[in-house]
From Swiss-Prot:
Xref: Gene3D superfamilies: Hexapeptide repeat proteins, Malonyl-CoA ACP transacylase, ACP-binding
InterPro entries for the chain: DapH, DapH_N, Hexapep, Hexapep_transf_CS, Trans_hexapeptide_repeat, Trimer_LpxA-like_sf
Record protein name field: 2,3,4,5-tetrahydropyridine-2,6-dicarboxylate N-acetyltransferase
Listed EC numbers: 2.3.1.89
Keyword set, alphabetical order: Acyltransferase, Amino-acid biosynthesis, Diaminopimelate biosynthesis, Lysine biosynthesis, Repeat, Transferase
Pathway noted in the entry: Amino-acid biosynthesis; L-lysine biosynthesis via DAP pathway; LL-2,6-diaminopimelate from (S)-tetrahydrodipicolinate (acetylase route): step 1/3
Record-stated family: Belongs to the transferase hexapeptide repeat family. DapH subfamily.
Catalytic activity from the UniProt record: (S)-2,3,4,5-tetrahydrodipicolinate + acetyl-CoA + H2O = L-2-acetamido-6-oxoheptanedioate + CoA
Coiled coil (UniProt feature): none
GO molecular function: tetrahydrodipicolinate N-acetyltransferase activity
Protein purpose: Catalyzes the transfer of an acetyl group from acetyl-CoA to tetrahydrodipicolinate.
């Protein structure tokens, strides 16, 4: 059995699927309770407040039990929750030397490099890696085990396919200094070479050579990256660090 408390070697679709299957499912909730309730400390339950007002934080079944036991003492209560039977917690981002904007969803077992930028609405799945100085723009999706190099821009709404469902033995790899336009899709197992540019809206189904520009559905090479392209696709360092 996988030890879910260690840094498991989640390098393929089947290991990740087993990790998810064996993980203890969680429905954490927060309850605001008005009333002089009787509640004792127990594992998995945090209690805050005063004599006639309590905030309870814990698993749904534990909090519901407290509310049911005190229903005659409760004037009213409000329950907050944002997930149900979740298998993977969110990443603890407090230690990261990166910019993480509100609304980004980053699951556990993700690696994020120094000065990376994760914008609002971006979703980064388990096992993904984001390199230094890279930006994951608004509503972009980085699938499970997706590998993003350094100084990469993944445009708004772009999708980097993961290794899960359909299972893939090879993750998507975006090498350093790549620019991916808005709403582009990079399919399973594709490698985008260093310095390449993927035009907005493209669907990339095969490897992209370094320093080339691809566009279209499916994406095809349209030219080699030149100075004009470099100027149009350069990163803004002021947005990082």
């Amino acid at each position: 059995m996988i030890n879910l408390n260690t840094n498991d070697n989640l390098t393929n679709a089947y290991e990740i699927a087993r990790y998810i299957k064996e993980a203890k499912k969680s429905t954490p909730v927060k309850a605001y309770v008005q009333g002089k309730i009787q509640v004792e400390e127990e594992e998995g339950l945090k209690i805050f407040g005063s004599e006639d007002f309590k905030i309870l934080i814990g698993e749904l079944e534990v909090v519901e039990k407290v509310i049911e036991q005190n229903k005659d003492r409760i004037k009213y209560y409000h329950l907050e929750y944002d997930r149900r039977n979740s298998a993977i917690p969110l990443l603890d981002i407090t230690h990261l030397d990166a910019r993480i904007e509100p609304g980004a969803i980053i699951r556990d077992k993700v690696k994020i490099g120094k000065n990376a930028v994760i914008m609002m609405g971006a979703v980064i799945n388990i096992g993904a890696e984001i390199g230094e100085n890279s930006m994951i723009d608004m509503n972009a999706v980085i699938g499970a085990r997706g590998i993003i190099g350094k100084n990469v821009h993944v445009g708004a709404g772009a999708v980097i396919a993961g290794v899960l469902e359909p299972p893939s033995s090879v993750p998507v790899v975006i090498e350093d200094n790549v620019m991916i336009g808005a709403n582009a899709v990079i399919l399973e197992g594709v490698r985008v070479g260093r310095g390449a540019v993927v035009a907005a809206g493209s669907v990339v189904i095969e490897d992209v050579p370094p320093n080339t520009v691809v566009a279209g559905v499916p994406a095809k090479i349209v030219k080699v990256v030149d100075e004009k392209t470099r100027e149009k696709t350069k990163l803004m360092e002021d947005l990082r660090g």
